[in-house]
Amino acid sequence: MVTDPIADFLTRIRNAQMAGHRVVDIPASNLKKRMTEILYKQGYILKYKFEEDNKQGVIKIALKYNADTKQPAIQSLERVSRPGLRQYAKPAEIRRVKNGLGVAILSTSKGVLTDKEAKAQNVGGEVLCYIY
């Protein structure tokens, strides 16, 4: 049993990129689906597909690599808030990731949002992870 599904999600992507895989399968949940949509909109992954099965479903993510250097598009996936130590931020406390080059994913009262979306809507929430 996985005690931290978000950390598992990030670790599966990180390990697949380190191994040079093109596609990674991740057990689905609504939170992971929304995080995947954010990764796609921010340009960190090529495409994704949700597949239903008898259990919870699977998210298939096509990873993105630089065509010239073969380096992954995602340089770092960093879990911030964790089950043992939750990290919350007010709208004014949401900091930029890598001076605006990265993205923070937050779980807010208005759903799962990026740091820029949360600031624009003036909502704070739990800082799930930093991606750059």
Listing of model-derived features with the role each one plays in the protein:
Residues 1-132:
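Core subunits and conserved enzymes of cellular information-processing
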